[in-house]
Each structure stands twice: as structure tokens, then as C-alpha cells.
Amino acid sequence: MEYDYIIIGAGSAGNVLAARLTEDADVTVLLLEAGGPDYRLDFRTQMPAALAFPLQGKRYNWAYETDPEPHMNNRRMECGRGKGLGGSSLINGMCYIRGNAMDFDHWASLSGLEDWSYLDCLPYFRKAETRDIGPNDFHGGEGPVSVTTPKIGNNPLFHAMVAAGVQAGYPRTDDLNGYQQEGFGPMDRTVTPKGRRASTARGYLDQARPRNNLTIITHALTDRILFEGKRATGVRYLKGDAGTGQTAYARREVLLCGGAIASPQILQRSGIGPAELLQRLDIPLVQALPGVGENLQDHLEMYLQYSCKQPVSLYPALLWFNQPKIGIEWLFNGTGVGASNQFEAGGFIRSRDAFTWPNIQYHFLPVAINYNGSNAVKEHGFQAHVGSMRSPSRGRIQVKSKDPRQHPSILFNYMSSEQDWHEFRDAIRITREIIAQPALDPYRGREISPGANVQNDDELDAFIREHAETAYHPSCSCKMGDDKMAVVDGQGRVHGVQGLRVVDASIMPQIITGNLNATTIMIAEKIADRIRGCQPLAKSNAAYFIAGDTPARTSPVRHSLPVTSYP
């Protein structure tokens, strides 16, 4: 089998490339995916409110675990990644957040990445998006990704939590992806007008499937990329449960879109990576690149949970006898509780004036439960998910063998810097001050977690070590740039070889301020134009917020109540 391009991974980036490259009728593309189809009748992946279900099994989840994390009580921590058409867009939380404009301006300040500024990237965000309330300078109206905005009449806790954030002295913003990310406001989601998950399989692949120049093979686990000298020429993969070896060849390029965990593994198994590691595993060296698998970053987060004095939370939706009605309304009408991911409000703040753009993110949820669906509080409640955005901590990914079925060694090195501890302590204390504001007086019950007894630095640190969790945002493990630890250039081309690119979240040089899916799609849209030889989209001239000397907050309406005095 020979194609012009072989794409490894039908995820958030790979599906974008498959759709865009096959717009050229004379180009042939093979798309390889280790998982299976995105079954449209499987509520676990298609119903937004069921987002916890895919993380509880292995049909759609690689279910990686980290090595014992030394600063987190040596816990082996979850590292769920999507498996199947859609990749992690098939199992993520569907929060449509692009990051802060300053993230991209920072990227563009790095040598070789000058065309990755916010105004360079904004046209590609717009190209990918169809927002349900229409386009503007920041949002698109004709893209493959359906974006739904919160509507009047949604849960009153969303509005109360945003109002509390403003009363605590932080800005309000009406669009976390618009002129000003900083502040509290409504949160958009990747959900279709019919209440279905808007994965890239639905948005991009559905457009491309009818084309004769696209071949999709599922249950195809990539073993390694093949080379002739320094040129990538094809892919060796294992097909089906039997693991039958197959080979496909690429006339032009191999495009690696495996994500921040799989892409460095595949490069290392193919002979591209740290020379010492490859020699130890008897992997023939094609190109020594010490940065492959290094610079690994993620977002860590915690939940602060409270009981709710009024019966307005989503707790009844967790009870089995209410779920058939919710499911029927969603299935036939695409409406109701099932049609939302229930992350309809959130925000970004600076915990201290020293930060030039937000370093803390909030997701508000009108129920008290872990992200993966475990440990649901058996009463009406609500919670704030809070975590730092740009930790200085850096991890790494290393293959353990040549076997593509063996999971790699993953170490994020969470909380390995003093800044991490300052930020998370600040985050807990600021959250308590937000929850104490008058807007939440009608709803705020007792603090369930961390609890009134967790107050001083040592107590907060112990809570963080034991309870902080991944936000499922691994990135940066094959970073763009031209320094000695860079893996690819600003167009995703792997240094030192020909005919090979990496296009996914792994090539971010630094993690962004927010959820990764929208930005991963943007990266793929931008590089797709490069691959096709298209003129880049014209740079935007939209104005955007820069904090400058603006204080991180003003005086709160109410200074924090002692935790023990909460009603």
C-alpha cells in the first residue's frame, strides 16, 4: 500500500489533517487509528453529560498511569487519553477554551516560532469553529467544530458562582475566548445543536469519509515509522487483536498525530530520541534528539466541594431512577441535562499581581463529584475545580521496550517547584474567599472538601499531595523550536530527518492557559495549510486585552468568612 501521506492517530489533530489534505482530490491519505470507531449510538461518548464514563473503562481510553509521583505521596496517577476515532476529543470534557492571547505571543517570542503569535493563530481558531450565536472578530461561523454557548435558564449555581467571583474582586468577562480571557464568565462547549459531543470525528471526518482519496484503518496500532537513511518512508503497524504486521508507504510525508503521550513513544521506537535511551533498548538510532519525551507538562487541579442548601444542584441526575428520563430526552430531543457537559461557567485569574496573565483556572460544576465519576457526594452540592496553568515542573516520557503494546514510563514531576506550592495554597484560599461572597449565601452549605480543619500551609499541602488530580492536559513532549531540546520546527517538521512531522499537543513549547483541545485543532489547521502549500490566512487585527499594570483584583465585597462560620 502506498499513499501520499500517512497520518498516525485519528485524534484531535489527525482528523483535521485528514479532512484538509483530502480536499485536494489528487492527494491520497491513509489514516491509522489504534482504537475503534466512534459508535454514534454509544451514549458514553456521545452524551455530553456522560463524560465520566469513557474514563472508567478501556474501550475508549488508553488508561495510562504515571510512575510514582515523588511529590504526590508517590501516587501512581491517572493519565487517560482517548482511543478511537476522535482521540481525546472523543472522551474529553468538551470545554471549548483556547488559551490566553499571551500564551501565543510568548510562543512567538521564541526563536523560529515568530508566526505563532495570537493574531497569527486567531484566524485558524475561527476557521475551525461554528459558534451557535454567530461569528464575530473572535469566533467563526462556518467551521467543522460545533461550539455551544450557555443559555438563559441554565442552572442558577452557574450564575451565582460567576457573580461571587466578581464580588471577590475579579473581572467579569462575557467571552473566555474573546477580547478578554481574564475574569469569570460563561464557558462554551464543543457540543452540536442536537446535543451531541462535537468530536473531530464528527466535525472533520464526517466531511472527509465520502472522499475516495481517504482510507481509514481502525484497530491499527503503530509499531514504528520506517526510514531509508534519514527519510521517513512508511509505517509498520499491527492490525487487529491478532497483531498481524502490516506495512504502508508514504510518497510525501508521514504525519505523526499520536498526542503528547504516544507521539514521543513512537518516535523513540522508530529510532528518534535520546541516544542513551535508545542504545539501552537496542533500538537502532536514526536521529539523536534529546528532547523527544522531555519537557512534558500538564495541568493539575483540585476540587473544593460544598453542600448546597437549596435543591438546585444536579445531585438528582446521579440517582439511577432519574437517569432513564434524562437519557430519553437527550436521545430524542437533544435537550435537557444530558445535552450539556455541565461546565457552563468558569474563569481565569491572576493569583498575584506579579503574573502578567492568568495563572489560575476555574471550572464550576453544580454537583459534587470527581471528574471520572467516582466519589459522588450523596447530597445536593457544588464544586469549584481550580488549578495552576503554567507550572515550572517538567516531566518526561520514555519507552520501556520495543513492544508497541507496552505502556511507557510517564513521570510528570507534579509539584516539584516551590512556585507550585505557592500557587495551589493561594488557589485554595482565594476559592474560599470567592465561595464566601454574598451571591452564594442562598446556596452555600458546609465545606465538604478540603474541610474546615484544613487551614495552615502544612494542612493544605497534605491535602494537595493526596487529592490533586490531572486535568488530562498532557503536552509539550515534542516541542517546537530551534534550541537543542526542540524536536520539531515551527511547521512541525522533525529536526534532522525528512518527510516526517509531528502535529498535535506535544509540539506546544509551553502549555497554554486553559484546556487543550481547541488549540490542538488550531495547530493542525495552521500546519495543514503549510503541508498543502497554501498561503497562510491573513493575520487578524483584532484588539485583545493585556493586563499591563492592572491589579489582579480589587477589594472584595466581603472578606473571607471563617470556614467554621459557614451556615
Swiss-Prot record:
GO biological process: glycine betaine biosynthetic process from choline
Entry annotation: catalytic residues: 473 (proton acceptor)
SUPFAM superfamilies named among the record's database cross-references: FAD-linked reductases, C-terminal domain (SSF54373), FAD/NAD(P)-binding domain (SSF51905)
Cofactor(s), names only, from the UniProt record: FAD
One term of GO molecular function: flavin adenine dinucleotide binding
Catalyzed reactions: choline + A = betaine aldehyde + AH2; betaine aldehyde + NAD(+) + H2O = glycine betaine + NADH + 2 H(+)
Residues engaged in binding FAD: 4-33
EC number(s) given by UniProt: 1.1.99.1, 1.2.1.8
Keywords, comma-separated and alphabetical: FAD, Flavoprotein, NAD, Oxidoreductase
InterPro entries in alphabetical order: BetA (IPR011533), FAD/NAD-bd_sf (IPR036188), GMC_OxRdtase (IPR012132), GMC_OxRdtase_N (IPR000172), GMC_OxRtase_C (IPR007867)
Organism domain of life: Bacteria
Enzyme class: oxidoreductase
Pathway: Amine and polyamine biosynthesis; betaine biosynthesis via choline pathway; betaine aldehyde from choline (cytochrome c reductase route): step 1/1
GO cellular component annotations of the record: membrane
Function in brief: Involved in the biosynthesis of the osmoprotectant glycine betaine. Catalyzes the oxidation of choline to betaine aldehyde and betaine aldehyde to glycine betaine at the same rate.
Family of this protein: Belongs to the GMC oxidoreductase family.
Protein name: Oxygen-dependent choline dehydrogenase
Upper classification of the organism: Bacteria, Pseudomonadati, Pseudomonadota, Gammaproteobacteria, Enterobacterales
Gene: betA
